[in-house]
Amino acid sequence: LGDVYKRQIQDVFFGTDYHSHLGTRRGGMTSFSPELGFQRNIHSIENSPFRTKFEKDVDKMRGNICIGCISDTDPQPIMVRSKLGLYAVCSIGVIQNAAKLADELLEKGCANFETMSSGAINSAGLIGALIAQKDSFVDGIRYAQDKIEGTMSLAIMTDKSMIVARDKDGRLPIIIGQRSDGYCFSFESFAYQKLGYSTCHELKAGEITEITKDGYNILSEGTDKKKICTFLWTYYGYPTACYEGVNVELMRTRNGEIMAENDMKNGRLPDVDFVCGIPDSGVPHAIGYANKSGIPFARPFIKYTPTWPRSFMPTSQSMRNRVAKMKLIPVHELIEGKKLLFVDDSIVRGTQMRETVEFLYENGAKEVHMRSACPPIMYGCKYLNFSRSTSELEPVSYTHLTLPT
């Protein structure tokens, strides 16, 4: 999230914190003031929330322009110095050919890259180096978009303005907010609405736009091409968010209604006592199913929200498995001897589904039925890191589930 106006530091602090559901590894803020120049702070947020790590930094930061981000991979923002000047870069997406692009730049002797503890190249730094190959930000961004295999949305902060670019296929959103004394941009619209802004523009696929304290100017027109990630509505997006004008919570509820309609039409409506949803994103799907089917909705398990994050966020598979099991606390009175249908938002690795079925039977459920709000994820996504497949992180197509009898 970025901002240009007189109270921007605190607004970016709170607005970036509203993106905490999108990442749990690194947070960063960069501001600029004529007196102090660029000021940057980056912290690990794996064991502490964004607000806790940055509240002292905010008191010290000064400037008339500021940008912040939360990342599940790279430390960001990255500072880049080139013929285009000194600027900060944030990015989101997956660069499949990062190593190849880095080698090409190094062979030209035109770049040094910041590496992460894993040894991988920081994607924001790579993008900044690609942009620096051209004589303007627009040409540089277009060049980077053409060279990158995968998905790249980015934000650049100079000492005068911010430039934002949505990926060519429009897989991820970038939204601009307006208030009487300034403008901002964000991934999530609700992040700035709580700060008094209202949405004034949503970037099209491939669009490049400059934002100043006086307004925004489209530097390069986008297209109506839409390949936005459906997982934003299914799972990843926050319930209050809207993408392409469609609210996440309403979509999930309607999806549950459609599942119930299909079951009723095909004679598959189960004889159960309750419909329940896997917290958090499975709950509205379950509410929609219950409303349409007439089966009562109940919460036989409660997510312990103070400490347990979403189960796909931890970096190791063993920790994901443990989180999936530990975060749900049973309400025995709503489980023992009951026939239950639970609704989950998706089946990616099968970990949570298996744990939930075992959890319900272990706590005395008589029958357990389940519905998934979207088809099983059969392959890892090469464009975004929502459901990527690695050697220890395999989609459900390769997983055999043994359920209790």
Which residues does each PLM region occupy?
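A conserved beta-strand->alpha-helix junction
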Residues: 117-125, 297-309, 401
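Extended, hydrophobic alpha-helical segments in both membrane/secreted and soluble proteins
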Residues: 275, 282-289, 297, 339-360
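Conserved short alpha-helical segments that host acidic/polar catalytic motifs at enzyme active sites
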Residues: 3-204, 210-273, 278, 367
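Short, glycine/charge-rich flexible loops or terminal/linker lids adjacent to PRPP-binding catalytic cores
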Residues: 294-340, 378-390
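Secondary-structure transition/capping motifs at alpha-helix termini
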Residues: 265-271, 291-298, 332-336, 358-367
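Conserved small/polar residues in nucleotide/adenosyl-binding loops
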Residues: 2-8, 399-405
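PRPP-dependent phosphoribosyltransferase catalytic core
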Residues: 160-161, 196-202, 357-401
